[in-house]
Amino acid sequence: MRETSVHIVSLGCPKNLIDSEVMAALLEQAGCRIVSGPEEADILLLNTCAFILPAREESIDEIFRLAEWKKAGKCRHLIVTGCLPQRYGAELAAELPEVDLFLGISEVPNIADHLRVLMEGKHSEKNRVIVTNPLFLMDAGHPRLLSTPPYSAYLKIAEGCSNRCSYCIIPRLRGKARSRPIEDILREAEDLVDRGVRELILVAQDTTAYGRDLEGKPTLALLLRELAGLNTLAWIRILYTYPTGLTDELLNVIANQDRICSYLDVPIQHIDDDILAAMKRRGDSHLIRNSLERARAVIPDLALRTSLITGFPGETPAKFHRLIAFVQETRFDHLGVFPYSPEEGTPAEKLPRQVSQRTKETRRNLLMEEQAVISHEINQTLVGSLQEVLIEGPSSSPDYPMIGRCRRQAPDIDGLTYVKGGKQPFLPGSLVQCRIVAADDYDLFAEVISSPD
């Protein structure tokens, strides 16, 4: 396969992105050349998402887009991997003859072997779809070709999910929760830091469930203490926590370790107790409120992000107004809202009192409008404050020529910090002390007060 060129498109969440990075590195080790555009590629590889309807639609659209390159260019084969074939492999094969090979989630470590067989013409129609039980769990021995900027990387600490939310298909796609041993995670983290990574972003389906399946039941708090000992690492950020997992031990570790950002992503989905029960979420509204209040009390200057679902079956106007009142009261720093997507095979799909798509979208928009006001007000309170900013690169603004993120901002999902002053340009990955001089709904504007570290 030497000099075979491969173009990889990765859709969905950061956890899926890591799978794509592993496949890219394995293909490169096998002699392939990873290229940035489909027009350069012999092989097109699409790693898909199938979590909700919009994700499936995006995946199908991308298959058709890449298939056009296959028809028109030098591309020889189109491979589709990930959650979509894991869920619909046989159906996809019947409907999409343009695709040469469909691979499920457990085939990530075998990608080079599959490509070799495909290029040798040994793949038959019978094994055009290869989907097995989702048992793959990456370890530090799996290489990664980072697709994120070199100063920031995601670190997958577990795979799968043992929560049984009534609306969610993830346990069927990814299997039960499987945690990586602390020693293995530390090996990968050390390698990433040696490669220049300054920000590690911990991800899993539920990061606070980390270790429950391992002997000795190590906790996320213990893992964080170990990671915080990596000397040249600047920031550790935690995504995908669960309200019931915000233990005092975890909150105190975040509060007392300088390298851990005062930032928590806590998807709560709803606040109405009837809706939470129908969702089969662990914990009620009292637990959610208590968890968030404790987090803010323990961690100074905590930035809170959450995700919500609108239009879940049974969400009456009164229940929705309870949700919007909670958002107004709690004042999250960052918020994502998703209209409920009925997923085939989930208990929620069969619930009575389904809500119209139009109502779901309207309620989502109302929440986001309210959040824009809240975010603007919170950002205004930051004007005059000192913030450490991780420089990402040049911006398009002549007034603020550099762009970055402060500890309150996760990549891709939160706002940005625009930077002026100092001896610019700064190298991407530099940490700069800044004073916030202005703010809008989602972004901050800062002036450098000290040189990069």
From Swiss-Prot:
GO biological-process terms attached to the record: tRNA modification
Cofactor: [4Fe-4S] cluster
Species for this entry: Syntrophus aciditrophicus (strain SB)
GO CC, any one term: cytosol
Every Radical SAM core domain range: 147-377
Role, per record: Catalyzes the methylthiolation of an aspartic acid residue of ribosomal protein uS12.
InterPro entries: Elp3/MiaA/NifB-like_rSAM (IPR006638), Methylthiotransferase (IPR005839), Methylthiotransferase_CS (IPR020612), Methylthiotransferase_N (IPR013848), Methylthiotransferase_N_sf (IPR038135), NA-bd_OB-fold (IPR012340), Ribosomal_uS12_MeSTrfase_RimO (IPR005840), rSAM (IPR007197)
Catalytic activity: L-aspartate(89)-[ribosomal protein uS12]-hydrogen + (sulfur carrier)-SH + AH2 + 2 S-adenosyl-L-methionine = 3-methylsulfanyl-L-aspartate(89)-[ribosomal protein uS12]-hydrogen + (sulfur carrier)-H + 5'-deoxyadenosine + L-methionine + A + S-adenosyl-L-homocysteine + 2 H(+)
Single annotated GO MF: protein methylthiotransferase activity
Positions of the MTTase N-terminal domain: 4-120
Domain TRAM, residue spans: 380-450
SMART domains: Elp3
Record's protein name: Ribosomal protein uS12 methylthiotransferase RimO
Binding, [4Fe-4S] cluster 2: 161, 165, 168
UniProt cross-references to HAMAP family, sorted A to Z: MTTase_RimO
Enzyme class, first EC level, given as a word: transferase
Top-level division of the source organism's lineage: Bacteria
Cell compartment(s), UniProt: Cytoplasm
